[in-house]
UniProtKB/Swiss-Prot annotation:
Gene name of this polypeptide: rpl30e
Family as reported in the entry's similarity comment: Belongs to the eukaryotic ribosomal protein eL30 family.
Gene3D superfamilies according to UniProt: 3.30.1330.30
Official protein name in the record: Large ribosomal subunit protein eL30
One example of a Gene Ontology biological process annotation: translation
Statement: the UniProt record of this protein carries the keyword Ribosomal protein: yes
Keyword match Lipoprotein: no
């Protein structure tokens, strides 16, 4: 039996709510572009994101005072969680919609 923490369940539920009611952008290169324009509220990166891209995202997010959350799973895990048949390395949150994902992540 796989143990799933309560925090993980709430994160996954809020991520699904975010995808239904909010506005997000997938992809590291697009994330960097939108971070530079300060049009992002938060960025979620997969733990397996390539090092140079992760450093760029962290650097520009720090300059723009945008929080970055590192998802513990791989890009494939994040893609599956988002209901996509492909890997997702980065999710940029433009509008959180009805989800409380920003609050949940800030609590961590």
């Amino acid at each position: 039996m796989i143990k799933v923490s309560e925090q993980q369940v709430s994160f996954e539920g809020e991520l699904k709510s975010l995808l239904k009611t909010g506005k997000v952008i997938f992809g590291a290169k697009r994330a960097i572009k939108y971070i530079k324009l300060s049009k992002v509220k938060m960025v979620i990166v997969a733990s397996t994101l390539r090092g140079d891209l992760k450093q760029d995202i962290m650097h520009y997010a720090k300059l723009s005072n945008i929080p970055v959350y590192e998802y513990k799973g791989s890009g494939w895990d994040l893609g599956t969680l988002c209901g996509k048949p492909f890997m997702i390395s980065t999710i940029s949150i433009i509008d959180e919609g009805d989800s409380k994902i920003l609050d949940i992540i800030k609590e961590r």
